[in-house]
Each structure stands twice: as structure tokens, then as C-alpha cells.
Amino acid sequence: MGRICPVNSRARRLRARPGRPSGDSLPYHQLQGGAPRLWSPDPGRPAAYRRAHVCDVTAPRWGSTSRQGEGAVLQRMLRRRAPPSWSRDHAYSRRGWENVALFLNRKRKQEGTENTSICCRPESALACGGNLSPQFLKKVIQIQTQELW
């Protein structure tokens, strides 16, 4: 499974060390685990033994990194339903792009601008959602002057 963000193995090794230099607050991916860390059998491990997949760019997710300790008691609504996992790494697969395209098409249909291609008939200008691109106008002029290509 190709990872989206580059994995920094050194950082991961450092993160796996038992001693936590900055206070005793765990990394946020452990705080947001299945149960607050009081319930987990070993407080050094996340309650559900899994890692949330997040790139380092998105790290301070619900609060700034400096206030990490409060992440253990998140509001129920903010907690994500299921953890993103490598099995769901299909965001950039072909299927993912198709889903995005379908969704955008639906959205465009609701806005009434679904047909953005160069139309072949001038009267379909309204079907284009008033999308009068230069190519479209050129085509209209060609049709009107019957100079087809």
C-alpha cells in the first residue's frame, strides 16, 4: 500500500521511546484512541492498538500541539467515527477520483452548469448554464456562417 505522506522512520522510532520528554502527554494519535488512557491496560499504549494515519502537516488537529493533554476528553461529536487506516488508502486510487467526479457532476447539475463542453448548437447556450467560453462562441459563429471546420 503506497503511503501518501513520507514515513519518517527516525521520528517514529523517537516517538516509540517510553520516556516522554514533554510532560507526560501522549502523542495525539494515542489520545484520540478508542478509550481515554485511564481505561487502557497499559497507559503508554493507545487504548485501541492502532495508529491513526495522519501526515505531520495535519498534526495539530483539534487544538494546538501545546495543549495536547486535553485531547483525551474530546467531545463526542469531534471524535471521528472510525480510524482512517491503510486499508482505506484508496483516496488517490482511480475509484476515488471517479467518486469525486461523480459527486462534482451531481453538484454541478444542481447548480445548472453541468454541461461545460463545447456545444454544437447555439440554442444550447442556456443548457450550458450560460457558460459562454471563447471556444463556444467560435463554434456558434462557425455554425451560423455554415463554415463547419
Swiss-Prot record:
Region named Disordered:
1-41
Q: What is this protein called?
A: Down syndrome critical region protein 9
Its source organism is Pan troglodytes
